[in-house]
């Protein structure tokens, strides 16, 4: 794999119209990941590689092909070839859900919405893991555009994420209903591109790949958030290509949020893997459908990892609040948990989801689930 090969792909992007196929992108990214492994010095060779990689990624962004479904999917598959994936047997049916087998979920957003809201997807994952029959295996990273990413929050809560990797996940898997996998410990290829992404300072195809890189194949339902309406349908199709057996909600809050929004409407693109052909069903959500009041995003802001962890553990998971208190962060978490629950059950009884979320919190199950994971990691 050579710089000349990468240059040939760049020239395909510069043709009018662009001639780069989705398969070409897959192969080009394999070349890039291979080349960047060599860039550990300030040598002339490294400078040459950085220049050619930057040229390719910039040209790709200008063509907007990196926001097309087939291209996003092939890019994700290329990165996964440089990842440490987890090989797991499926849990026995009676371990989690005696009637239908385990429901294993993830909830994660692309980021990039610029809203800097509370760590709601991580919080909702923890609360949902306290609901009988659900197992949440959340995959995420640390903050890039906000002040507290999922990894920052989990680390501040006391989990030694350095111990959670492809070798230890199988040990943690049987006895935990909540798990968190920090992306950099599984995707070494993404580590190689981090310098070039910072150097470029513009969004690239790598900015949208995170939710499509889950290292555990047994996740069978997921909520993936996107930051723009235009990206959402393409992202839904990409998710169907990367996760063909997964039922998926792609969510976009109309205020520009990659979560189910606490104010205004949220559009959901629904991928049903049991359908004979890929037809995206869309529907809308708003807080009133959950029996909740609306809350301004400023009332659901992130305060940084330390304060977010305190609020989550000492206020939300401790049972300080109840439905009807109209606490913005509490309601925000309830709402996103309810959507996870309803996805797991295959229905849209959002108010039932709220009830299940509250039961998880006030029974202490959610907090126990979090603490059990932290203790399990510590004992590795």
UniProtKB/Swiss-Prot annotation:
Keywords: Amino-acid biosynthesis, Aromatic amino acid biosynthesis, Glycosyltransferase, Transferase, Tryptophan biosynthesis. Its cofactor is Mg(2+). GO terms for molecular function: anthranilate phosphoribosyltransferase activity. It catalyses: N-(5-phospho-beta-D-ribosyl)anthranilate + diphosphate = 5-phospho-alpha-D-ribose 1-diphosphate + anthranilate. Pfam families: Glycos_transf_3 (PF00591). The keyword Signal does not apply. InterPro entries: Anthranilate_Pribosyl_Tfrase, Glycosyl_Trfase_fam3, Nuc_phospho_transferase. GO terms for biological process: L-tryptophan biosynthetic process. Gene3D superfamilies: Nucleoside phosphorylase/phosphoribosyltransferase catalytic domain. 5-phospho-alpha-D-ribose 1-diphosphate binds at residues 109, 119, 121-122, 142, 144, 146. Pathway: Amino-acid biosynthesis; L-tryptophan biosynthesis; L-tryptophan from chorismate: step 2/5. Its EC number is 2.4.2.18. Mg(2+) binds at residues 258-259. It comes from the Eukaryota. One of its GO terms (cellular component) is nucleus. Belongs to the anthranilate phosphoribosyltransferase family. Present with 1760 molecules/cell in log phase SD medium. This is Anthranilate phosphoribosyltransferase. It comes from Saccharomyces cerevisiae (strain ATCC 204508 / S288c).
